[in-house]
């Protein structure tokens, strides 16, 4: 659930209300309470989460780069790693879509083919989960890729 608000000069607010639909004008009560708690936080929770995401990012990049044939540069934006896995696109694995399906079947890890984002030979992984899940997921990917040689 997401909740947002705008602080702007009156002329902009008036223009926004002219195009805004009723579907976004009455947020649910629990979302309003969540927003209130976020505003009371003074930025402590976001700062803590930024540190946590840096740890997760650094771990997943290092762990992926330790796998033979996988190269991952450190992302600077959202919480996704985007490693190059073209080394494993051979034989029965014809493309990153096949590799993603293989990782799901063999490793029980869901990844998104890079071709969905215009980059064939890559996969996208989210690190918006616990460190424990990240470690297990990367280990499963490693074991599955080792079977491919």
Annotate each language-model stretch with its function.
Residues 1-149:
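PLP-dependent class I/II
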């Amino acid at each position: 659930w997401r909740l947002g608000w705008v602080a702007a000069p009156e002329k902009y607010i008036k223009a926004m209300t002219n195009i805004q639909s009723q579907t976004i004008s009455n947020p649910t009560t629990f979302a309003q309470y969540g927003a209130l708690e976020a505003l009371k936080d003074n930025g402590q929770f976001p700062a803590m989460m930024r540190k946590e995401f840096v740890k997760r990012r650094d771990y997943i990049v290092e762990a992926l780069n330790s796998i033979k044939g996988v190269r991952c540069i450190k992302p600077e934006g959202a919480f996704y790693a985007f490693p190059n896995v073209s080394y494993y696109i051979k034989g029965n694995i014809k493309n990153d879509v096949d590799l993603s399906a293989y990782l799901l079947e063999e490793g029980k890890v869901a990844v998104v083919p890079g071709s969905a984002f215009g980059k064939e030979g890559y996969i996208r992984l989210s690190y918006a989960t616990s460190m424990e899940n990240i470690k297990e997921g990367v280990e499963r990917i490693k074991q599955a890729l080792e079977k491919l040689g």
